[in-house]
């Protein structure tokens, strides 16, 4: 006959009250419905707002946006639009969304290079060059290109003038051409632009000075001065079909030298020292 040993008492284990409740419900078939997941109402709008707020808190402004260069550009935009170039630093700090210390960093640099001056503790005034034309970069570039073209054209014209002056010097300095340095009445008469006009020819030594004062309503006055010899004045009234220059006009004033027809100049040796001469011609309409 077998002997029954007394049952040993097992050590107690820690059991979660929640798990014990579940076990009891599992043993009880009546409470099976209690195991079904309960409906939980979720407010999606609140969760969306919550997530968006978290993301907004994590978003940081780029480093460039808060750099001194960026703030200086924004500051200059405010200066350009400020009446009289006067700014209130308190308002500037508010518009830029920075501390006043950052604004003072900008104004101190501009004050050091004499671009702004302090009107009061919180007010500065722009004293630099006009900022209204700083935005016209394309127009400025176009003007620079036009200026470059004009400079190139000016250089080309200077070369042409220099070349013409050299040719004229070689022409007048040639001894063979010296004896032909004159014009005749027929030469003047052949010029179409001189027809029906009064032409006054002047023969004067070198360095003769000719002054034409402001013309009057009915006349024009010409002053001719020479310190190296006499001045010869010739009246040549060119008319269509005329073949002589001996005609005179009442509208031409007299001069110290008598008017005479054009003739071939004959070189003469100067025995006397040069005499000063002055001619005053007045032509009336």
Swiss-Prot record:
This protein's GO cellular component annotations are: MLL1 complex; RNA polymerase II transcription regulator complex
Q: Which residues bind DNA?
A: 50-129
Pinpoint motif DEF box by residue range: 95-129
**One Pfam family per UniProt:** E2F_TDP
Q: Where is this region: Dimerization?
A: 130-222
Annotated SMART domains: E2F_TDP
Q: Which residues form the signal peptide?
A: none
Amino acid composition bias (Basic and acidic residues), ranges on this chain: 260-272
- Provide the primary localization: nucleus
The UniProt keyword set, sorted, is:
Cell cycle, DNA-binding, Isopeptide bond, Nucleus, Repressor, Transcription, Transcription regulation, Ubl conjugation
| Record SUPFAM superfamilies | E2F-DP heterodimerization region, Winged helix' DNA-binding domain
State the residue spans of region: Leucine-zipper.
143-164
Q: Which family does it belong to?
A: Belongs to the E2F/DP family.
| Quaternary structure annotation from Swiss-Prot or TrEMBL | Forms heterodimers with DP family members TFDP1 or TFDP2. Component of the DRTF1/E2F transcription factor complex. Part of the E2F6.com-1 complex in G0 phase composed of E2F6, MGA, MAX, TFDP1, CBX3, BAT8, EUHMTASE1, RING1, RNF2, MBLR, L3MBTL2 and YAF2. Component of some MLL1/MLL complex, at least composed of the core components KMT2A/MLL1, ASH2L, HCFC1/HCF1, WDR5 and RBBP5, as well as the facultative components BACC1, CHD8, E2F6, HSP70, INO80C, KANSL1, LAS1L, MAX, MCRS1, MGA, KAT8/MOF, PELP1, PHF20, PRP31, RING2, RUVB1/TIP49A, RUVB2/TIP49B, SENP3, TAF1, TAF4, TAF6, TAF7, TAF9 and TEX10.
Report the protein's function: Inhibitor of E2F-dependent transcription. Binds DNA cooperatively with DP proteins through the E2 recognition site, 5'-TTTC[CG]CGC-3'. Has a preference for the 5'-TTTCCCGC-3' E2F recognition site. E2F6 lacks the transcriptional activation and pocket protein binding domains. Appears to regulate a subset of E2F-dependent genes whose products are required for entry into the cell cycle but not for normal cell cycle progression. Represses expression of some meiosis-specific genes, including SLC25A31/ANT4.
Q: What is this protein called?
A: Transcription factor E2F6
């Amino acid at each position: 006959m077998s002997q029954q040993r007394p049952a040993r008492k097992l050590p107690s284990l820690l059991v979660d009250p929640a798990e014990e409740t579940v076990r009891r419900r599992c043993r009880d078939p009546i409470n099976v419905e209690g195991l079904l997941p309960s409906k939980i109402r979720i407010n999606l709008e609140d969760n969306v707002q919550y997530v968006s707020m978290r993301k907004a808190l994590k978003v940081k402004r780029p480093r460039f946006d808060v750099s001194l260069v960026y703030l200086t550009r924004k500051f200059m935009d405010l200066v350009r639009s400020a009446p009289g170039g006067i700014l209130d630093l308190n308002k500037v700090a508010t518009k830029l969304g920075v501390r006043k210390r950052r604004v003072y960093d900008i104004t101190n640099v501009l004050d050091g290079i004499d671009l702004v001056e302090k009107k009061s503790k919180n007010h500065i005034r722009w004293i630099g060059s006009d900022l209204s034309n700083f935005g016209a970069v394309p127009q400025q570039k176009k003007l620079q290109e036009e200026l470059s073209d004009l400079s190139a054209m000016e250089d080309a014209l200077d070369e042409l003038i220099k070349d013409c002056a050299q040719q004229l010097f070689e022409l007048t300095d040639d001894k063979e051409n010296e004896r032909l340095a004159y014009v005749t009445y027929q030469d003047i008469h052949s010029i179409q632009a001189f027809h029906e006009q009064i032409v006054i020819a002047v023969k004067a030594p070198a360095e003769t000075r000719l002054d034409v004062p402001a013309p009057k309503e009915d006349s024009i006055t010409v002053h001719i001065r020479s310190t190296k010899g006499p001045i010869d004045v010739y009246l040549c009234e060119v008319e269509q079909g005329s073949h002589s220059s001996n005609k005179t006009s009442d509208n031409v004033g007299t001069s110290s030298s008598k008017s005479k027809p054009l003739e071939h100049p004959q070189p003469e040796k100067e025995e006397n020292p040069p005499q000063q001469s002055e001619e005053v011609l007045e032509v009336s309409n």
